[in-house]
Design a protein with these regions (language model features):
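Short catalytic/signature loops enriched in Gly
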Residues: 4, 13-20, 34, 160-161, ...
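ABC transporter nucleotide-binding domains
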Residues: 1-260, 339-341
């Protein structure tokens, strides 16, 4: 695709199934407290592949490390250890020019669209800015054509009604559409979407997710979808990775993870979600998580979930932490007692 274009041909089914555009291996990020007394393990050995044209959901409670993982992929912060390979390029080996190109190919949709926009800019300036930074379009007329095309993709038409407005003049849903358009305008390979619908009203969330899913299919994009809401991950993602205290504890297709969860933490997340059934709202089952999430500077021995798990035994504390185990079809989990529960 040439630089001014904003559409990408959808990949073949074989490419979507087999080709990894993002490979994360043993990724780690430690933060040191201001006094240097504590080392916070925000991301603690995360590994996964993202296939071409795939949506991977990273799901977990606040503090599980999912947003930090997204920032590491975006190179907004540097990893303490591990590797991130995008389309065959190891990000640790990128020079200045390669890093600049990388930031065009890997884009982020932020949780708060208003905070990510200059309030003094008009919408046309918000969308033109990335084109100027990356030298796309030799004239403003060319760039405005790309701006209008991006706005058409996110259903903000006619564009003339919005171009001269400022961000505060738009609704939350409209701002998120503009944030999505700004990401798409650079024709990225991968989009990291960090809680993209959590700050807009419930009635608009499904609409925005439908829009993003349609655009993803049309352009053949790969998404890392970060969310605390496993119900939106079920709708939006092809695969789901459940994170707890810096590690992935279960990963697989969304059907397997949601319909046949193995790890007790995954089960608790799912069972806490209310879904409409037979005209009323019911809780699926009753399985509560006890206590608070431990500090990432003092991770429990053995299984890190054991302090909140209803099924934990002494061996969960004394034996080494369980590694991810494949139980078939790429469905992996990290629970030693999964057959018993």
């Amino acid at each position: 695709m040439s630089a001014p274009d904003t559409a990408r041909a959808a990949p073949s089914a074989a490419a979507s199934a087999d080709e990894a555009v993002l490979s994360v291996k043993d990724l780690r990020k430690e933060f040191v407290s201001k006094r240097g007394r504590a080392r916070v393990k925000a991301v603690d050995g995360v590994s996964f592949d993202l296939r071409r044209g795939e949506i991977l959901g990273l799901v977990g409670e606040s503090g599980c490390g999912k947003t930090t993982t997204g920032k590491l992929i975006m190179r907004l912060i540097e990893p303490s250890a591990g590797s991130i390979v995008v389309d065959g390029m190891d990000t640790a080996d990128l020079g200045r020019d390669e890093d600049f190109a990388y930031r065009r190919r890997v884009q982020m949709i932020f949780q708060d669209p208003y905070a990510s926009m200059n309030p003094h800019f008009k919408i046309k300036d918000v969308l033109e800015e990335p084109l100027l930074i990356h030298g796309i379009g030799s004239t403003r007329a060319e760039r405005m054509k790309l701006v209008e095309r991006a706005m058409e993709m996110v259903k903000m038409t006619p564009a003339s009604e919005y171009l001269d407005r400022h961000p505060h003049m738009l609704s939350g849903g409209q701002r998120q559409r503009i944030a999505t358009a700004r990401t798409l305008i650079l024709n990225p390979l991968i989009i990291v979407a960090d809680e993209p619908v959590s700050m807009i009203d419930l009635s608009t969330r499904a609409e925005i997710l439908h829009l993003m899913k349609s655009i993803q299919a049309q352009m053949g994009l790969s998404f890392v979808y970060i969310t605390h809401d496993i119900s939106t991950a079920r709708f939006f993602a092809d695969r789901i990775a459940v994170m707890y205290l810096g590690r992935i504890v279960e990963i697989g297709s969304q059907d397997e993870v949601i319909d046949h969860p193995v790890h007790p933490y995954t089960r608790a997340l799912i069972e806490a979600v209310c879904e409409p059934e037979s005209g009323r709202v019911d809780t699926i089952r009753k399985l509560e998580i006890t206590g608070e999430i431990p500090s990432a500077s003092d991770i429990p021995s053995g299984c890190r979930f054991r302090t909140r798990c209803l099924y934990a035994t002494e061996e969960c504390a004394t034996l080494p932490e369980p590694e991810l185990k494949d139980i078939g079809g790429g469905h992996m989990h990290a629970c030693r007692r999964w057959k018993e529960i």
